Every structure is written in C-alpha cells, then in structure tokens.
Regions:
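Residue-level detector of intrinsically disordered, flexible termini
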Residues: 1-3, 7, 148, 304, ...
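N-terminal amphipathic/basic-hydrophobic helices that include classical n-h-c signal peptides
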Residues: 1-38, 363-364
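Conserved active-site-proximal phosphate/metal-binding subdomains
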Residues: 192-206, 212-364
Length: 364
C-alpha cells in the first residue's frame, strides 16, 4: 500500500501547483478535477453497478425498505432492500415502490437460509432487480439464473477463504464485512479482513464494518477496497422508517455501548446494550438449561425495537454508532461522506482508486 500513498502524495503536490500530468493508468488528472468531488470517482465497483458513488447501503432486516433504498440509490449510491424473513408480496411491493422513487440501479438482499429463498431468487429475476447481495449461505444454486438475467451478484463474506470460494462460484464482487458491523457478525475485524481479501481475489472488494464517515471510507480505500457498505450510518437518515426511539439510541451511543449475543449458539449478533440484551447474555451462561427460553425471547425481538420498544427488543447496531450524531437526508449523508474522505491526506478518492488499480496491474 506504500505505492498508493506515494502516488497520492505526488499527485497532491502536482495538483496544488496546477500542474497537469498523465496518470500512470492513462488518466489525465488536472487541477480542476481535484475539486469536483466524489461524483467523479470511478472504480470497478461504480462501473460494475452503474452507480455514481462507491457507497452501498447495507441490508438491514425489517429496516431497509423502499424508502431508504430508493433514497440512497437516487443520491448516487446503491440502495439495498432487505428481504430476509419477508413475504414475497412485501418484496414485490417494496421493489415497485422504490422504482417510483428512483430509476437508478437498485439492489436486494437474500438470506439464503430463509425457507422462501428459492422463490425469492426467482422473484428478483422477474422484478428485474439490478444487484443481489447474499448472506447466510452459498448462492451456488441461484448463480446461473441470476447471471443469465444480468443481475450482479455480491456475497457478503466474513473470511478470506469464503471470499475466494465466492469468486470461484462467479460472484461479481464481494463485501468483506468485519466484526465491527451490526447484526450477524464474524470474528475478524475490518482492518484485518479487508487487506487479506483484496490480496486473495481479483474481483472488486467492498469494505464494511466500522465505516460511518469519510475517515472510514479513506481507510477502506487505503486497504484496497473499491467501495464501502454502511448500515449503521443510514439508520438515522430521514428516509429510514425505524422508530424515533431506535434512532435516538444510535445517536446517543458511545463506543462501548454494543454487545455481541448468541456466540454460544453459533449465531452471533451485535446490538446495543439494553435490558433485553443483558437478559439474553445472562441466560446464555447456561444454554442447555435456558435454550428454549432464549428461543422464545428472540421471536419478534428485532421487530419490537424497530417499532420503538428499545428496552425489550434487539437494537442492531455497529460499533461505529459512536460517531453518528446527526439526523440528515440520505443525500446529505452521502455528500458529506465524500467531502470528508477527500479532505483527508490531500488526495481524492479517485487517486486512491487509481493507485489501487496500478498496484493490481503491477502485481504489488
């Protein structure tokens, strides 16, 4: 990655002197372009998905609906409708509603262990969805059908080995998601996972987990990512339909306010600490004795939080909630994210992206 920073520094020095120089990849970059912002950023992720900015909104079950996904896509990113656990009619209605908000690319997420995964996979083809992200299983059974329909397939992975397997299956890109993220999590941090995955696969890698501002975006690009996925940052935007009480919990969270439940049962979930989470952790001390009670507690726990019961529900959130302090529109958030990222280090995200391309080209 030293090469990336070296090129970024060289170009910053040249641009501030209003000197033009051909980019090593053949891209002419002059002083005016330096200030045009993220709308000029082109990476393999933006090219693959046909989006303007390399920012994807994470699929949050019971939260990421047409209102949120449509707003993010319209703002230039990629909005994702979360289909996990949802009836097919709801999915159809949400995709159609999002299409009324935006004509830009739109995605949907499939949790492959869901009982209706096969029917959902076919429905998304019928609905002509642009992108499918996947989790909780292998997309092998649906890859051929999706690819034949022109759908871009992006699995979410928590390990390098899984990223390599997804590339072999034909995935167009992967989201490398660290344990800092909210919801279901793996073991590796984003800082450890992301460079390992970018070194191991040739397809584009999207960084996720612990990213909520320009610093996180710049860091992900420095580690080799060509885009980022964020969930927690979009929980408080105007277009997110969760209850105000949920949003206020995110806005007031401190860096030590999340907890991971479910590790003992093999289904770890990161959420904010509250009465419900503490009760779960206490019962998890003896799974053999309390397993049935835990199962009953989990039923409807996310729905309760989303609807406003923030004491007796699961408030899924990433650790990065500690840096989320304001309510804004999705467009305002995306514009702010890019401005912040490009203010760091005196270089544009385009320069970082191009430096990463050079690194791949040179085999570094």
């Amino acid at each position: 990655m030293a090469l990336a920073f070296e090129w970024a520094q060289i170009y910053h020095e040249l641009l501030t002197q209003r000197i033009e120089l051909p980019h090593p990849s053949g891209f002419e970059l002059g002083y005016p372009q330096f200030w045009k912002g993220i709308l000029n950023v082109k990476t393999r992720v933006t090219e693959l998905l046909g989006i303007e900015v390399p920012i994807i909104q994470g699929a949050m079950a019971r939260i990421a609906d047409a209102s949120l996904a449509g707003a993010v896509s319209e703002a230039g990113g990629l909005g994702i409708i979360a289909c996990g656990g949802a009836p097919l009619d709801w999915v159809r209605d949400q995709v159609e509603a999002a299409r009324k908000i935006t004509s830009k690319p739109l995605g949907a997420n499939v949790m492959l262990m869901d009982p209706n995964a096969a029917e959902l996979a076919k429905l998304l083809v019928d609905l002509e969805i642009d992108v499918v992200t996947t989790g909780a299983g292998s997309p092998a059974n649906y890859m051929e059908m999706w690819k034949a329909a022109g759908i871009k397939v992006i699995p979410v992975v928590a390990s390098t080995a899984l990223a390599v397997r997804m590339e072999r299956l034909g995935a167009d890109a992967v989201v490398a998601e660290g344990t800092e993220s909210g919801g279901h999590v793996g073991e590796l941090t984003t800082m450890a996972l992301l460079p390992s995955v970018t070194d191991a696969v040739s397809i584009p890698v999207i960084g996720a987990g612990g990213i909520a501002d320009g610093r996180g975006i710049a860091a992900a690009f420095a580690l080799g990512a060509e885009g980022v996925q964020m969930g927690t940052r979009f929980l408080t935007v105007d277009e997110c339909t969760v209850a105000d009480a949920y949003k206020e919990k995110i806005l007031s969270a401190k860096d030590s306010d999340t907890i991971v439940t479910g590790r003992g049962s093999g289904h770890p979930v990161r959420c904010l600490k509250n009465k419900f989470a503490r009760s779960v952790k206490k019962l998890e001390g003896d799974l053999a004795k309390n397993g049935d009670e835990l199962e009953r507690m989990y039923v409807g726990s996310l729905r309760r939080a989303v609807e406003g019961d923030v004491d007796n529900g699961t408030i899924m959130s990433g650790q990065i909630a500690a840096v989320v302090h304001e309510r804004k529109s999705a467009k305002e958030v995306i514009d702010e994210l890019v401005s912040e990222a490009e203010a760091l280090g005196g270089c544009t995200l385009q320069q970082m992206a191009d430096a990463n391309a050079d690194r791949r080209r040179l085999g570094l």
